[in-house]
Curated annotation (Swiss-Prot):
Sequence ranges of the Sequence repeats: 1109-1110, 1111-1112, 1113-1114, 1115-1116, 1117-1118, 1119-1120
Region of interest (Interaction with PCNA), ranges: 163-174
Modification after translation: Sumoylated; sumoylation increases activity.
Sequence segments annotated as region (6 X 2 AA tandem repeats of K-G): 1109-1120
Domain-level remarks: The N-terminal part is required for homodimerization and acts as a regulatory domain. The CXXC-type zinc finger specifically binds to unmethylated CpG dinucleotides, positioning the autoinhibitory linker between the DNA and the active site, thus providing a mechanism to ensure that only hemimethylated CpG dinucleotides undergo methylation.
Region (Required for activity): 651-697
Motif stretch (Nuclear localization signal): 177-205
Domain of life: Eukaryota
Annotated DMAP1-binding domain residues: 16-109
Sequence segments annotated as region (Interaction with DNMT3B): 149-217
This protein's name: DNA (cytosine-5)-methyltransferase 1
UniProt source species: Homo sapiens (Human)
Length: 1616
């Protein structure tokens, strides 16, 4: 049977005024004069006004009465609210004494305002009434599917509300002290009140009896229809009475009234009938069961006679009424405003059903229909069809359990007949729900009605339950009543949409749990991918699952996941802590720890639950295993029992239901408690009280790292600055002084406490603080002078605990540092032995063997060192090779020599004086930081070094905020911040570039040059954006194009940031493209720019000629601090062989692609388990061997001596791999912020450990580990420390840093942690200097480890050589495509527009654009994307709150604002801003408040207050901005946020994402669209990899030069 829906809602502009008879008005005035108490006055007013109040006001009064009875509201508060409601209606009545006229369905004067009751009554009002004298007979609904001859009555008309006549009953009994009563008791109270108010009821019956024709009567009560029929005399009497009253109040005539207000008559008639008949019906039926709602709503069998409207008869009266209305004096402004406010407030509280909580004006509100010939539950259950026994059997009595039956064609509804779901907590709140349907025997699997027994008003439902899955996709759901249990089959047609949602949520829960079982590292985007690619079962009548499906059912899904975790062991990592579940919980605002009654809801049972045993065992070398086994000796538990007992102590938030329940007394933790007779040793919380909120908090603490890292004070230096009183008796010199230098006499040896020390020995030094360990140093000089006494020069060692390694370091290992100090000999404690452990000659082939012990035994005075340590940059390098000369052996200090050399390089100096002028001296060259600058060189200068002689238009600023219609855009108020993620408004300018014309020093007053004040005069170069053409010119020009100008500027030499090459394009021996690709820091110009005339000219000859400099290639280079500042051209062309590379966890090959572009690598092997990514790697690297196996299995094969794998692929052997790179996944141990026995076990078996074992076995020349930025912060940086510790133990030089990919030429913010390592004998690469400027907020790259801040060697912190790359640079040339575009190959339809696009397109012979495809989003998501404005910074907060027809034909609803948001207040129009009760003080979330299928996603305003208003979700990219970190699945509500195209209504395509990563257009991807997105999102941006590769290349060149020079020296020595 078709479900009945409420009529569509018409926008309400005003509330119709009530009309009171004169006698009622007079009585109200008398009440004001009577000396009544407030309570008595309110009671009398209610008695007088009750029948005239609007339905909405009555509902609110009922709600107030309920709150009073439940003692949720005080009597004073109740009286105040009732007075407010009555005054509201009275104020409207006083403002308008006449009804709005309605003619042929339209209101006069264009007034379309209607109240709720007026709208709902339209269905009956439009059907003409039958003659009053004709008796009515009930009519049954047709079952043959024919169209009904008259519209069905409105649900609002038939809604039963027995409490409307009992509002005053509480006054006599003391409302504040009254206890809550059952529904039956309230009904009895209703009867007594009706008896007392017979006169009032009689009057109401007399006024409304003739209007009862508008109400269809129940089919079961034809007798009542007769008793209710009026005689003609009674009608005439009533008509006379009304005429008399109308003459006094100028009310319309009865005919006019009947014509204009049929809806009001219907409403009044229904109210009268309900009051009259309610008690009699209640006596016939059980108090807790609803009335026969279907019978009440059956239309009559006979179609009533049509009554033609008589409009002309009332024409004169209409004209008089119109004239009276025009002459009525206008209301004062204050009254108008008050009335408007009243109207507004009434709109903010839409009426709800007091039973099921559904909105009464919801167009989707439906009413239950009973099956034909339905009977009550006891009668139904006794039907012989449901008996499973023969007539002779009496087995029923032998069962204690309730009988079980199947139920088909069922509907569930509340007392008022509204169809409602069973899973929203109504049953848990003791709301009585009933159902109807056809019951069948338990063995009958046929869902049809055949063979069933139809029942109605079954229940109420005591509980509902899920029995799991029937071996397939369908969940078995059941009800329990007091009489039986029912297993549900097929719902009725009207209930199918509601029940379908329940089946959907159960099936989605099954998908999620099964997905998390095998994907513990998954992200939210991965989960959405799984949901969207799962085909729904046929029974759900769904085409696809969407993200909206998951968010709609998030609370239920999370509860099921929590229940799944409860079934696990106490030491298991809960799967609800996976990254995807944490994101879902935040986004949907899920309440954790809700423990609903176990009997009411059971969890999905997994009969074949796969127990999570953690990751598979990692294959490790003995060295790697030894390090972990040693460090975690106390935490590794060999016995599983001990491991569980030593799990970390659980903490609780104390707020959620889980924390507040008592201990169970049954679990392992409880049995150990003293109160339950245990020992109390484990001190663990009850397993039933495992707090999900605290677990979430701890997991989140480890997930995101705050960008605003505080400045930490550096640790105190190891040396001592104080003098110590000397004891001459214990210190004596041995031998004579070696040399006397001024007051100092140098010695070779000294005797301290009978122990002889000599220069070069190592000692322990006493600290001032006795709690600190002894300091260790090498004695590099011994002397005595008259002022300080007996002294020595200490070159300090650094203990491993004082490095970034911290507690993971070897306690016997020391590190050299560039720190030294003069100390008194009396500070020496004793002599110690420090051994230098040099790498063995066969170091590269020793990988995987048993590690040799670095020291035999520990006598407390023997240590060793291998490496030198840079305390600022956390770099471990080979010790310096500086050797002393013969004449300074007695006082040579390596630290002093290195520090002096560095200071010399840093100090600017002038060289080669040219000319001495009056006020200055000219020079040809100058040095700074080891770099030589000559006249004619190009130099980088900071942006503030000089300005240009043209006034540029001010940078684009956000337009001032225009006033917004807050009713249409209710979430716009959340955009109070001007900051937009992905905006380049605060990006710095790139370096100024000049050509040195003069190097000079001004003269001092004595005529000598002031060489500490070096200045340079430069010719300015304009960039395209610096000319009058401004920023647009830069998009089409090459990024290294400049314009010469004759403008000059004088700049301090100290401000110079580096050297660059600027050439005239026509003078180049090769084309501009070849020149530009030949090395870094290369620029060219073709024209000169005249700022005065704003014109471009040919450059002058002196600009074209580089002067005496030639091209200045490679002259005068010293060793710089940053190798990136050097020109890349070597002095002698050296052919470098490419490194044989193994790429582990290669993905589609972004890292290898960057190394190939740098020209340093030949990737011969790659390991990638995920097949689509492995196939993509093969497509782009056809010469590589790609293994699609577990890396642990491959390493085990190699270590076992195998040369091929099971597929016959040749395995790389020891000595084959020269470079090892990869990005091991590390989310598996990121769930908790600190290590414990289980998380350590996960880490020990993680892929990071496997990767380190690869490094130890193969011992490559260079090693690179790439990972997410948080890799350096996981487990309080323990993962970082252990990784570096392994590399140091192997003998590698190593360092770590964080790089921003956006600074190396992509339009994307992507911070990545990089660990670099170089074998002994190689040079450890520096991190590449940034090439492009980028948003400062995204460039916080420092790392805090153990309260010490570490930075990398990067010096370009505030600017860079090139401008930032933008979204426009990236993809403005790509053709327009629509949502869901799927053509794999299309044409470009145009030339590249920017330098970046030219680089990525390359030189294709027949250009084809591949993978310009985008995800097909659901109809609702597509509608949201269409309504996101195109302005920069637009996101979900700019969505209008409107109804929209979706592409699938359905309608998206408006979002309802139903609660007062205490944080955000109300809108400017006074509208509410809250969508759930949790925004009100001290209230929890209301499951019934959830809204779905709305244009504004309900979950975002629900949780926005605690998540930065979800800024960026459904956000558009900005043409002049950049991408957020490209993820594996672009979702408008995912982490990446801004994934909408700047101008098109779709998410970004695969090719656009690939370009945001810097992949060339020729780079091939493999698989379906989601596979390709994942390949791109997981990759390392090739430009970043290229920049690192070029640094490695510099190190290889430096070593090659050293080898070449050493060879030349050997040859020269051999000749001699």
């Amino acid at each position: 049977m078709p479900a009945r829906t409420a009529p569509a809602r018409v926008p309400t502009l005003a509330v119709p005024a009530i009309s009171l008879p004169d006698d009622v008005r007079r009585r109200l005035k008398d009440l004001e004069r009577d000396s009544l108490t407030e309570k008595e006055c309110v009671k009398e007013k209610l008695n007088l006004l009750h029948e005239f109040l609007q339905t909405e006001i009555k509902n609110q009064l009922c709600d107030l009465e309920t709150k009073l009875r439940k003692e949720e509201l005080s009597e004073e508060g109740y009286l105040a609210k009732v007075k407010s409601l009555l005054n509201k209606d009275l104020s409207l009545e006083n403002g308008a004494h006449a009804y709005n006229r309605e003619v042929n369905g339209r209101l006069e004067n264009g007034n379309q305002a209607r109240s709720e009751a007026r709208r709902v009554g339209m269905a009956d009002a439009n059907s003409p009434p039958k003659p009053l004298s004709k008796p009515r007979t009930p009519r049954r609904s047709k079952s043959d599917g024919e169209a009904k001859p008259e519209p069905s009555p409105s649900p609002r008309i038939t809604r039963k509300s027995t409490r409307q006549t009992t509002i005053t009953s509480h006054f006599a009994k003391g409302p504040a002290k009254r206890k809550p009563q059952e529904e039956s008791e309230r009904a009895k109270s209703d009867e007594s009140i009706k008896e007392e108010d017979k006169d009032q009821d009689e009057k109401r019956r007399r006024v409304t009896s003739r209007e009862r024709v508008a109400r269809p009567l129940p089919a079961e009560e034809p007798e009542r229809a007769k008793s209710g029929t009026r005689t003609e005399k009674e009608e005439e009497r009533d008509e006379k009475e009304e005429k008399r009253l109308r003459s006094q109040t100028k009310e319309p005539t009865p005919k006019q009234k009947l014509k204009e207000e049929p809806d009001r008559e219907a409403r009044a008639g229904v109210q009268a009938d309900e009051d009259e008949d309610g008690d009699e019906k209640d006596e016939k039926k059980h108090r807790s069961q609803p009335k026969d709602l279907a019978a009440k709503r059956r239309p009559e069998e006979k179609e009533p006679e049509k009554v033609n409207p008589q409009i002309s008869d009332e024409k004169d009266e209409d004209e008089k009424e119109e004239k009276r209305r025009k002459t009525t004096p206008k209301e004062p402004t204050e009254k108008k405003m008050a009335r408007a406010k009243t109207v507004m407030n009434s709109k903010t509280h839409p009426p709800k059903c007091i039973q099921c909580g559904q909105y009464l004006d919801d167009p989707d509100l439906k009413y239950g229909q009973h099956p034909p010939d339905a009977v009550d539950e006891p009668q139904m259950l006794t039907n012989e069809k449901l008996s499973i026994f023969d007539a002779n059997e009496s087995g029923f009595e032998s069962y204690e359990a309730l009988p079980q039956h199947k139920l088909t064609c069922f509907s569930v509804y509340c007392k008022h007949g509204h169809l409602c779901p069973i899973d929203t907590g109504l049953i848990e709140k003791n709301i009585e729900l009933f159902f109807s349907g056809s019951a069948k025997p338990i063995y009958d699997d046929d869902p049809s009605l055949e063979g069933g027994v139809n029942g109605k008003n079954l229940g109420p439902i005591n509980e509902w339950w899920i029995t799991g899955f029937d071996g397939g996709e369908k969940a078995l759901i059941g009800f329990s009543t007091s009489f039986a249990e029912y297993i549900l089959m097929d719902p009725s047609p009207e209930y199918a949409p509601i029940f379908g949602l329940m089946q959907e949520k159960i099936y989605i829960s099954k998908i999620v749990v099964e997905f998390l079982q095998s994907n513990s590292d998954s992200t939210y985007e991965d989960l959405i991918n799984k949901i969207e690619t799962t085909v729904p079962p046929s029974g759900l009548n769904l085409n696809r699952f969407t993200e909206d499906s998951l968010l709609r059912h998030a609370q239920f899904v999370v509860e099921q996941v929590e229940s799944y975790d409860e079934a696990g062991d106490s030491d298991e990592q809960p799967i609800f802590l996976t990254p995807c579940m944490r994101d879902l919980i935040k986004l949907a605002g899920v309440t954790l720890g809700q423990r609903r009654a176990q009997a009411r809801r059971q969890t999905i049972r997994h009969s074949t639950r796969e127990k999570d045993r953690g990751p598979t065992k990692a294959t490790t070398t003995k060295l790697v295993y030894q390090i972990f086994d040693t460090f975690f000796a106390e935490q590794i538990e060999k016995d599983d029992r001990e491991d569980k007992e030593n799990a970390f102590k659980r903490r609780r938030c104390g707020v959620c239901e889980v924390c507040q329940q008592p201990e169970c007394g049954k679990c392992k933790a409880c049995k150990d408690m003293v109160k339950f007779g245990g020992s109390g040793r484990s001190k663990q919380a009850c397993q039933e009280r495992r707090c999900p909120n605290m677990a979430m908090k701890e997991a989140d603490d480890d997930e995101e790292v705050d960008d605003n890292i505080p400045e930490m004070p550096s640790p105190k230096k190891m040396h001592q600055g104080k003098k110590k009183k000397q004891n001459k008796n214990r210190i004596s010199w041995v031998g004579e002084a070696v040399k006397t230098d001024g007051k100092k006499s140098y010695y070779k040896k000294v005797c301290i406490d009978a122990e002889t020390l000599e220069v070069g020995d190592c000692v322990s030094v006493i600290p001032d603080d006795s709690s600190k360990p002894l300091y260790l140093a090498r004695v590099t000089a011994l002397w005595e002078d008259s002022s300080n006494g007996q002294m020595f020069h200490a070159h300090w060692f650094c203990a491993g605990t004082d490095t970034v390694l911290g507690a993971t370091s070897d306690p016997l290992e020391l590190f050299l540092v560039d720190e030294c100090e003069d100390m008194q000999l009396s500070y020496i404690h004793s002599k110690v032995k420090v051994i230098y452990k040099a790498p063995s000659e066969n170091w590269a082939m020793e990988g995987g063997m048993d590690p040799e012990s670095l020291l035999e035994g520990d006598d407390g005075k023997t240590y060793f060192y291998q490496l030198w340590y840079d305390q600022d940059y956390a770099r471990f390098e080979s010790p310096p090779k500086t050797q002393p000369t013969e004449d300074n052996k007695f006082k040579f200090c390596v630290s002093c020599a290195r520090l002096a050399e560095m200071r010399q390089k840093e100090i600017p100096r002038v060289l080669e004086q040219l000319e001495d002028l009056d006020s200055r001296v000219l020079y040809y060259s100058a040095t700074k930081n080891g770099i030589l600058y000559r006249v004619g060189d190009g130099v980088y200068l900071p942006p503030e070094a000089f300005t240009f002689n043209i006034k540029l238009s001010s940078p684009v600023k956000r337009p001032r905020k225009e006033p917004v219609d807050e009713d249409l855009y209710p979430e716009h108020y959340r955009k109070y911040s001007d900051y937009i993620k992905g905006s380049n408004l605060d990006a710095p300018e790139p370096y100024r570039i000049g050509r040195i014309k003069e190097i000079f020093c001004p003269k001092k007053s004595n005529g000598r040059p002031n060489e500490t004040d070096i200045k340079i005069r430069v010719n300015k170069f304009y960039r395209p954006e610096n000319t009058h053409k401004s920023t647009p010119a830069s998009y089409h020009a090459d990024i290294n194009l400049l314009y010469w100008s004759d403008e000059e500027a004088v700049v301090d030499f100290k401000a110079v940031q580096g050297r660059c090459t600027v050439e005239y394009g026509e003078d180049l021996p090769e084309c501009v493209q070849v020149y530009s690709m030949g090395g870094p820091n290369r620029f060219y110009f073709l024209e000169a720019y005249n700022a005065k005339s704003k014109s471009f000219e040919d450059p002058p000859n002196h600009a074209r000629s580089p002067g005496n400099k030639g091209k200045g290639k490679g002259k005068g280079k010293g060793k710089p601090k940053s190798q990136a500042c050097e020109p890349s051209e070597p002095e002698i062309e050296i052919k470098l062989p490419k490194l044989r590379t193994l790429d582990v966890f290669s993905g589609c090959g972004g890292l290898s692609e960057g190394f190939h572009q740098a020209g340093i690598s030949d990737t011969l092997w790659a390991i990638e388990m995920w097949d689509p990514a492995a196939q993509a790697f093969r497509l782009n690297n056809p010469g590589s061997t790609v293994f699609t196996e577990d890396c642990n299995i491959l390493l085990k094969l190699v270590m076992a001596g195998e040369t091929t794998n099971s597929r016959g692929q040749r395995l790389p052997q020891k000595g084959d791999v020269e470079m090892l790179c990869g990005g091991p996944p590390c989310q598996g141990f990121s769930g908790m912020n600190r290590f414990n026995s289980r998380t350590y076990s996960k880490f020990k078996n993680s892929l990071v450990v496997s990767f380190l074992s690869y490094c130890d076995y193969y011992r490559p020349r260079f090693f690179l580990l790439e990972n997410v930025r948080n890799f350096v912060s996981f487990k309080r940086s323990m993962v970082l420390k252990l990784t570096l510790r392994c590399l140091v133990r192997m003998g590698y030089q190593c360092t770590f840093g964080v790089l921003q990919a956006g600074q190396y030429g992509v339009a994307q913010t992507r911070r990545r942690a990089i660990i670099l390592a170089a074998a002994p004998g190689e040079k450890l690469p520096l991190f590449p200097e940034p090439l492009h400027v980028f948003a400062p907020r995204a460039c916080q790259l420092s790392v805090v480890v153990d309260d010490k801040k570490f930075v990398s060697n990067i010096t370009r912190l505030s600017s860079g050589p090139f401008r930032t790359i933008t979204v426009r640079d990236t993809m403005s040339d790509l053709p327009e495509v629509r949502n869901g575009a799927s053509a794999l190959e299309i044409s470009y339809n145009g030339e590249p527009q920017s330098w970046f696009q030219r680089q990525l397109r390359g030189a294709q012979y027949q250009p084809i654009l591949r993978d310009h495809i985008c995800k097909d989003m659901s109809a609702l998501v597509a509608a949201r994307m269409r309504h996101i404005p195109l302005a920069p910074g637009s996101d979900w907060r700019d969505l209008p709150n409107i109804e929209v027809r979706l592409s699938d034909g359905t309608m998206a609803r408006k979002l309802r604002y139903t609660h007062h948001d205490r944080k955000n207040g109300r809108s400017s129009s006074g509208a509410l801003r809250g969508v759930c009760s949790c925004v009100e003080a001290g209230k929890a979330c209301d499951p019934a408040a959830r809204q779905f299928n709305t244009l504004i996603p309900w979950c975002l305003p629900h949780t926005g207050n605690r998540h930065n208003h979800w800024a960026g979700l459904y956000g558009r990219l900005e043409w002049d901005g950049f991408f957020s970190t490209t993820v594996t699945n672009p979702e408008p509500m995912g982490k990446q946020g801004r994934v909408l195209h700047p101008e098109q209504h779709r998410v970004v395509s695969v090719r656009e994402c690939a370009r945001s990563q810097g992949f060339p257009d020729t780079y091939r991807l493999f698989g379906n669209i989601l596979d390709k997105h994942r390949q791109v999102g997981n990759a390392v941006p090739p430009p970043l990899a290229k920049a690192i590769g070029l640094e490695i290349k510099l190190c290889m060149l430096a070593k090659a030069r050293e080898s070449a020079s050493a060879k030349i020296k050997e040859e020269e020595a051999a000749k001699d």
